[in-house]
Structure formats: structure tokens, C-alpha cells
Regions:
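GH16 jelly-roll
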Residues: 1-111
Length: 111
């Protein structure tokens, strides 16, 4: 799950792997009107056949990637919690910007 500073209400479900990283990730998006002012539940379901991204009570994923022998989805992954700004993904930073906060209530992993 990624947020861009210049599009704060658009949620990106993104997978980075060989050939799909940097400026060419495998990503899907959804929009939440209050993404920066309310807590939300972000969910990733990683099954043997696919990885799917959900937010809040969605019953249909906003992004899903099927597994194949060419993809590294049968190996361990890292969960990255990141508050990044600027660059090619985040866009230019307002010169009047002084600070921001990323609040995480909890992280739960099931196996």
C-alpha cells in the first residue's frame, strides 16, 4: 500500500519484483475521500495463486496479481511502511511544507 503526497486520497496497491520496480511497478489504485483524515483497514491476501489488495470492507480487490512461475511470489516478502516524499513517484513538494504524520494503529499478520 502506498500513498503519494501529491494525491493523498488515492491508494496504490503495489508489487515490486524483477522487471517491475522503480518507475515500472505492478500497481492498481482506488480512491478514498478521507484517506488522510480517518483510519482505514488495508488488507493484502497472499494465496498460492495470487496477491490481492483491499481497503476497508471491499469484497472485490482493487488490485490483484496472478502468480506464475515467472514471478517470485513463492518466496518471503518484506512489508514496508514508508512515508516518502518527492521524486518521480511523489511529485514536487510544496515549498511551504513543514511536516506530516503517518499514524499506524496496528499491523496484524495471519498465516
Amino acid at each position: 500500500m502506498e500513498h503519494k503526497g501529491n494525491e493523498p486520497n488515492i491508494i496504490h496497491g503495489t508489487l515490486h519484483y524483477p522487471g517491475r520496480s522503480g518507475g515500472n511497478p505492478n500497481t492498481g489504485t482506488t480512491t478514498i475521500a478521507n484517506a488522510t483524515s480517518e483510519f482505514h483497514v488495508y488488507k493484502v491476501i497472499w494465496s498460492p495463486t495470487k496477491i490481492s489488495f483491499y481497503v476497508d470492507d471491499q469484497t472485490t480487490p482493487y488490485h490483484s496479481v496472478d502468480n506464475s512461475n515467472a514471478l517470485p511470489f513463492n518466496h518471503n516478502f518484506f512489508l514496508i511502511m514508508n512515508c516518502a516524499m518527492g521524486g518521480t513517484f511523489g511529485g514536487s513538494i510544496d515549498p511551504n511544507f513543514t511536516q506530516a504524520t503517518m499514524e499506524v494503529d496496528y499491523i496484524r499478520v495471519y498465516r
